Every structure is written in structure tokens, then in C-alpha cells.
Amino acid sequence: MAKRQLGLGKAAKAKKQKTETSQSTAATSQKPNETLRVELNEEADADDELAQLQALWNTYSKSDKENELMVNGIIHECDRLLRNWDEKNEALPDYFHAIYALALSELAKYKPEETSQCFQMALERLDAGLAAYPKSIDVNFAKSRVLLARIPLQYISTLEVSSQVGDYPNVSEMLDEALSVYEVAETEAEARKEYSKFNEDNLDILQALDDVLDMMDNFCKKEEEEDEEKEDDDDEEEDEEEEVIQLAENHPLYHIQATDKYNFWWRNHTLKFLTNVTKRTENTTQLQRELCTRLGQSYLQEAEVPANVYTTLKYDDDYAGLGELQGLQMEEGQKLAQESFKEALKYLKKAQDDDDPDTWVNVAEAMISLGNMYEMDSPDQEKWYDEAEKILVRANKATQGKYREILENLRGEDEGDE
């Protein structure tokens, strides 16, 4: 799999620290009207404190996760429940430990000066949960999420281009640990046939991995952009010719950037996630579409390098006579790109929504890219172009001309009336 050049999801963004805090967060569960209304599951007991905690966490996890007040409320409620259960000498359920730890890790976003402490407390809570429930699906999924969240906030944010392995923890080992714990939860959920665990909330773990890999892939680019902003306009032409900064082999992120191991892991486990989602009894159409979209995008990005090799060696006179580029011969690049584009199409077609023309256009654009991997004006190329055109005409009509430009480009027209 080619290294991701664009990323599959949104690049991880630093969260703005809230400037206003409440002095009454401990009373969150007692004064819900001061925060928000929490909806309980129909089967949940309104007098069940643990059910209320679950509902509060579910409300937060489905929100934009920008509510420090709610996070503090969840943590205070967990503290209270923990004291009460200790007094009763009763064991709390596994999901309690997961919620408590996740809330502590979320707090790290709002209190950057306490990042290390927040993650340490979160991991200690998870270890306590695993001591009581070694094979808990919820606790293991939560631990994977916390370990992934810690990497950018506690470690990558402190790195510079000049950083060396000996001065920082081994980021690769931390990443491996997070993925290993995820696999424990995944395997256990499959073994118990608890397919409901493969839901939107736990899909966030795979998205978190994608964001972390994105951050690592773009680490040097960020440094370069910051440097360029400080330079004069006179150096603009020179800047454009500069190559992306290469990390030294002793940099903490070097080996992660240099391998496709984690990209393959992401795809393989996203495929597993999709397989398990299809086994759920309830309607999961939207979740399946989301997964298929992500998988389709990953194959599109996998095709980028071989496609560029093929088109460059085939059509760029500056490379005339060159036998290979980036380790690939022209025919090899063509074949690999065709295979990846076809795989992308398989998933993008499954991701189509009759009410969302953008999803149709994703398919059409993949068809055009695939057509570009065939000889000019060949039957194969015309076949893919024709199919793409039909889709674009439909999408253009449905959106009153939104895709007119791409349709004209495909037709080679200056104007279009569709």
C-alpha cells in the first residue's frame, strides 16, 4: 500500500482549551437542566445510576466532544459511584472502568498542562478494569483508544525535526501496543458474537489511528510550512523547488513514516469491522456506507503512486527513455493502478446513497481515473468514460448543475448544457 499523501480522514487538529470553567461540575448529575438533557435507553431504569452514567457518556460521545463541563461531570459522577460501590464492597461493571478512563483521557484536551497526569490516571483505571475483567471488550477497546489519544497529545506535539530516539519514548512501540489491545477486543467480540460492539463509537478508534498516521505523515510538511511563512516573498521561487524535509533515521517517527505496516493494519481491520457490522441484526446501512467510503478512499490513494508512474513514463517527454520510476516500470504501474482503482470502485459503489449525489460522483471520478490507466481512445478507456458520463449527467441534473465542470472536462467541451 502506498504511503498516504492526503490522509483518509480529517487531520488531527489541536483542540482549543476552554477559557471558562464551572465551579459546580460536581453537581452535574444532580442538576441536569444546567447542562443538557440526557436521554435514557428505553430499557434503562431511570433510577439506575450506572444507566444514567452510560446515558451521559453516550450523549457526550455522540456530540462534537467540545463540552468540558460534561467531561468534568462524568468524572465527578464516576468518583462518586466508585466511593459508593467501595462502601458497599461491590464490584462495578466493566463498562464503568471504560467510561471513567475515557473521560479522563478526554480531559487532557482541555488541560494541556495536565496531559501526562490525565493519561496516567486513565491507564491506571483501565488496568484496574482489566484486573477485574481481563477479557472485557469494552475495557480493551477503551484502552486502545486512550493509548492512541495519548500519542499525539503527549508525544508528537513535543517533537521537532531534530528530535532523536534516545530523548523520547519509542512511538512505534506505543502504537503497536494500542493496536495489539484493539485486536484483543476485536477477537473477543467476534468469539462471543457480540457484533453490536462494532458500532460508530468504536469505529472512532480506527479513525483515531488514521488521524495519528496522518499527523506523522505530515509532520515534516507542517514544519516546512511554518518556516516558509517566516521567509520573504523574494524566496518564493526557491521555496517551491525545495523538497520535503526528510527525517533522520534516528528520529522517533522515521520508521513509522517509512513503513506501510500501519496503513495495511488500518485497512485490514476496517475490512474486519465492516464484515462484523454486516452481522448485526439492526439496520446498519449508514455505518456500512461510511466504512465502504473509507475503504474506497484508501484504495484510491494506494493507486496514486503507480498511476503517476504510468502517466509520467507514458506521456511526459521529460522522462522519455526512462525505464522505471519509483521502482516501477510503466507496465507495472499501469497494472497496479488498475487493480487498486477497481478495488476502490467495488467499495465506492457499495457506499452510494440514492439521496446523496456526491456518492455517485465519487464512483464516476474513480471510473475516470481507471479509464486513464488504459491506452488513449481504447475500448476499455471509452467504456469507463461512458459509464462515468452517465453517472455525472444524472448527478448534474439532480443538483442543478453542480457537476457541470467535471462533466465538461470529461467530454472535452468548453461549454455544456446538461
From Swiss-Prot:
Disulfide bonds: none annotated. It is found in: Nucleus. GO terms for biological process: positive regulation of SREBP signaling pathway; regulation of translation. The keyword Magnesium does not apply. Residues 1-36, 222-241 are annotated as: Disordered. One of its GO terms (cellular component) is nucleus. It holds the Pfam family Nro1. Residues 224-241 have a biased composition (Acidic residues). Residues 1-11, 21-30 have a biased composition (Low complexity). InterPro entries: Nro1/ETT1, TPR-like_helical_dom_sf. Gene3D superfamilies: Tetratricopeptide repeat domain. Keywords: Nucleus, Transcription, Transcription regulation, Translation regulation. Its main location: nucleus. Belongs to the ETT1 family. Required for correct translation termination and probably involved in regulation of hypoxic gene expression. This is Enhancer of translation termination 1.
